[in-house]
Amino acid sequence: MRRLNITTAEMESVCGRMVACRAAEHLGLNINQFYYIAKKLSLKTAFIKPRWSDDEDKRMQTLISSGYTQRNVAKILGRSEESVKSRLSRLRKK
């Protein structure tokens, strides 16, 4: 097996912050290599959705009212387009 030149910092930057298949792709690995390295480094690979902060809610609403699309807001906030859509819907119901 060839040596995988992935640093601990690179793995820590993606483990638990995105779905494993997307994290592996981001690092240029296949899924088996990703899990192998994560296990060797004792890193958790489970993706946990980050909670929305009040600041993010305010920023999202400001961006939307300024004319940004949900897709652009998602990119700016580092969220999925679907999560922005869902969060906007929840906030409008309050």
Swiss-Prot record:
UniProt-listed InterPro entries: WH-like_DNA-bd_sf (IPR036388)
Function: Modulates the activity of the host recBCD nuclease. And thus protects linear double-stranded DNA from exonuclease degradation.
Protein's recorded name: Anti-RecBCD protein 1
Gene that encodes the chain: abc1
